């Protein structure tokens, strides 16, 4: 082969040598009956998955914070605990009555805004709970009965 033919073959394509053959194959069609069974099975599996609850969405542990404020400024810290979805037991026995009333008013507004609840559970002791905590039962009736016995 001459040098001229080598260059010609190198830079140009010879149509006869590089012709591709296309073979068309018919795809096998799936019968509709089989396809509908697969869809039904998939849909039932998908429906079953809707009943599964993610464990990550469940809170690992609930916390209850005990607080004994000595000044009104500590009410903000208590409100922050409630905002962070923690229940708080507030003991107001070591603070003046007018300051205690202001704290209860502030915490009442906080739990109302957050959809929570505030309950008196003893003499100058309150339980503030966020919306994710349910409290059942009452102990204030028992306290009143004890005072009547003495």
Swiss-Prot record:
This protein's GO cellular component annotations are: cytoplasm
Where does this polypeptide localize?
A: Cytoplasm
Query: Which spans are transmembrane here?
Result: none
Encoding gene, per UniProt annotation = sepF
This one is known as: Cell division protein SepF
* Biological role: Cell division protein that is part of the divisome complex and is recruited early to the Z-ring. Probably stimulates Z-ring formation, perhaps through the cross-linking of FtsZ protofilaments. Its function overlaps with FtsA.
**What is the originating organism of this protein?**
Bacillus licheniformis (strain ATCC 14580 / DSM 13 / JCM 2505 / CCUG 7422 / NBRC 12200 / NCIMB 9375 / NCTC 10341 / NRRL NRS-1264 / Gibson 46)
**What are the protein's UniProt keywords?**
Cell cycle, Cell division, Cytoplasm, Septation
For the region Disordered, give the residue spans: 26-45
Biological process (GO) annotations? division septum assembly; FtsZ-dependent cytokinesis
Please give the subunit comment from the record: Homodimer. Interacts with FtsZ.
Alphabetical list of InterPro entries matching this protein:
Cell_div_SepF, Cell_div_SepF/SepF-rel, SepF-like_sf
Q: Which family does it belong to?
A: Belongs to the SepF family.
